[in-house]
Amino acid sequence: MNEYKIQVINPCQEFLDDLKEYNLPVHNQLCDTIKEVISIPFKSKFKRLENSDRDMRARSGNFRIVYFVKNDTIFITKIGQHKNVYKMDVGCPKLSKKKLRSL
């Protein structure tokens, strides 16, 4: 079994850091899904995005984690609510503290 490294782009890391501070349950849920992606990135429940040969998505409640695998590294490029994540070019939404608490 391959061992994968993880690379989280900076806006996604900032989003996770903010969630940790203002909404720990959602943060923990996303981190659990990221750990699952690291262990088996091509698991059947993780879907390939339409119109993409490389990008995959993992579902975590109302959130989606978009990533791709290159060699032995998993690159997380987007994290967001399912209604918005596919519209984003790359990264994560900038949300107020109040909005983060209400997720």
Regions found by a protein language model. Give the residues of each.
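Enriched for short, Lys/Arg-rich terminal
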Residues: N2-K5, D17, S60-F63, F68-L103
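Arg/Lys-rich, positively charged N-terminal/basic patches that mediate binding to nucleic acids
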Residues: M1-T33, L103
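A broadly tuned preference for mixed-charge, low-complexity surface segments
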Residues: N10-E14, R57-N62
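Non-catalytic, surface-exposed connector residues within folded enzymatic/regulatory domains
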Residues: L24-N28, K43, I79
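A short, surface-exposed loop/turn module that caps and links secondary-structure elements
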Residues: D32-R59, P93
